[in-house]
A protein has these predicted regions:
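Structural signal for interior beta-strand "rungs" in well-ordered beta-sheet cores
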Residues: 135-242
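Acidic, carboxylate-rich catalytic segments that either coordinate divalent cations
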Residues: 230, 239-258
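A signal for specific C-terminal beta-sheet/loop modules enriched in small/flexible residues
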Residues: 114, 123, 171-181, 196-197, ...
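Terminal amphipathic alpha-helical/low-complexity segments used for targeting or macromolecular assembly
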Residues: 1-133, 252-260
Length: 260
């Protein structure tokens, strides 16, 4: 909890500084961060502003999101861990405001977390609406039923696809163009399970009801059709094991070199 408060305090402080440094964005920083008393309020406001429109009120969405966050504080904690993941792993992220306001991967993941909550409340149409809006805004498609862990970094996000029965563990890094897809029209569990600390590089496709083991790395452009053990690197089409990792958390280093 103390760390969560610390991240919110830093986010708020940085927003004040950035608003002073760039007056044209001052209202933007105030509306989405500075005017709020806590992270949940800021997050609900920011997401609702992006996802609302002529037919769906942003204010109504904001109230709904606040209600969900109040009932499921784990979503708030996951969002904070995601923001920390960007700050620690992405060299282009030099403050917390960057992912919160400007990184579409962060927007897509937090929107899916709320859509996931709605999905489990049998509000499937609204969850699908959020999925649709995120697809239009962020050029990625994440099913509301997909299960996502915490501490996720989705870099760039363009072209990302995560299917309905996919499961993604904690502290995972996904780069642009990644697909966690099915391998046919089977019903039931048909998408991959991604273990903790996994890094999946740009353009990689992981297909079917298979598991990518903890702390593994998938090389860029690979097509993974079979289960991957823990702590290995796989690459190629179809992907094969090309090495064993001494780095147990490749998702943190974001090293796409498959030779080590």
């Amino acid at each position: 909890m103390n760390n969560s408060l610390s991240i919110w305090t830093k986010l708020h402080h940085q927003a004040v500084e950035l608003a002073q440094a760039e007056p044209m964005l001052s209202s933007h920083y105030h509306q989405h961060i500075i005017n709020h008393d806590d992270f949940a309020s800021a997050l609900a406001c920011h997401l609702a502003a992006q996802l609302g429109g002529e037919s769906v009120s942003s204010l109504a969405l904001e109230r709904l999101f606040l209600s969900i966050l109040g009932e499921q504080p784990n979503i708030i904690e996951s969002a904070l861990q995601d923001m920390e993941a960007y700050y620690q792993r992405d060299p282009a992220c030099d403050n917390y405001c960057r992912p919160f306001l400007f990184f579409k991967g962060f927007l897509a993941i937090q929107s899916q977390r709320l859509a996931h909550a709605l999905w489990h409340r049998e509000r499937h149409s609204l969850a699908r609406y959020i999925q649709h809006k995120v697809s239009l805004l962020c050029c990625c498609d994440i099913h509301p039923a997909a299960q996502l862990g915490s501490g996720l970094m989705v870099d760039h996000a363009t072209g990302l696809v995560i299917g309905e029965t996919a499961e993604v563990g904690n502290n995972v890094s996904l780069l642009h163009g990644v697909t966690l897809g099915g391998s046919g029209n089977d019903v039931g569990k048909r998408h991959p399970t991604i273990g903790d600390d996994v890094m999946i590089s740009a353009g990689a496709k992981v297909l079917g009801n298979i598991t990518v083991g903890k702390g593994s790395k998938v090389g860029a452009g690979s097509v993974v059709l079979n289960a991957v053990p823990a702590h290995v690197t796989v690459a190629g089409v179809p992907a094969k094991i090309v090495g064993r990792l001494s780095d147990k958390t490749p998702s943190l280093s974001i090293d796409q070199d498959i030779s080590h």
